[in-house]
């Protein structure tokens, strides 16, 4: 179960619905992937986990390495570059390549978003569709838009038979 900003950290609403659903199916195992703002919320559950919840994984949207000094260099190979193009330019996205790239332990979101390859793909998008606005504004907007995506792709996502997203 993928829960954005709610279960098991907030009482009521969507969280209440998720908790009721999990309890209604005790014969099924559930793993929670909770997307939360930052590590300050980690483990502060408002619900007691039912026995059929085997794990809670957390993904943090404000967990970025921007401030760790000098940016590491990253150079994408051709397949990774095309996958990045596909997601930014709206082509048929090569999710397998993006997941593989982002799941590497040494992968740096900072290095990707501040790197040459990201810059060139954004520049291509800008020239094709958005050249009427200031490029620096566009570049930083694109970094802000894609940061949450790459944070989630960098998170260890548990294997499951079915993924259900609620928000």
Residue map of PLM features:
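Short N-terminal targeting/anchoring amphipathic segment
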Residues: 88-91, 154-166
